[in-house]
């Protein structure tokens, strides 16, 4: 019989309800504007390289031996594509200030970020069962940017043992290496852990590593241990844990 030791959660549209496309649009436009000012370039000249660099990061098309953090990978792509060294201290500090002090104020009716129904109850139920928790959000953003969204979801005080960011990760979802590396930092095996997420692609490791997923997205996922709404997760958790331990 398997033993469940930890539950690891996705964030966007799992614990946090958010119009992610709107958020990315605002974030990308603001950062492009800042970099355009630094480089003294027209802002429109940065849209393509910024988008291409982010796409390259999220495509995960990297050599097996590439050990750069996602932050370093993105910075290298930006410098190669438009000549801006975003890790230089003055530029890095400017971007960090924006993400810590300005971005949190950008939540509006369009982005509409707020705790997802049932999210806090889900986390508390897992903790009440004596299990460990971590936040395995896709690490294609900085710690500051991720903490901004955690704040919108009232998650900053949750006792996550790990939050994956582009500073501490070398791959993105759904890479099996991303999941393996994240669990290794926690001292956990995939067979001891339950993933909770809404994305039918990114929240299922590829290739499979034996990590089971409770799916809280739209529709039904035949490969999930359990499918349902975030609001139902806490109510069904005893049954979910039983199915996990029975190897279903």
Segments (PLM) and residue ranges:
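A metal-dependent, Asp-based hydrolase signature
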Residues: 52-103
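Short histidine/acidic/glycine/proline-rich micro-motifs that form metal-
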Residues: 15, 21-22, 60, 137-141, ...
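Asp-based, Mg2+/Mn2+-dependent phosphohydrolase catalytic module
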Residues: 1-7, 120, 124-127, 136-141, ...
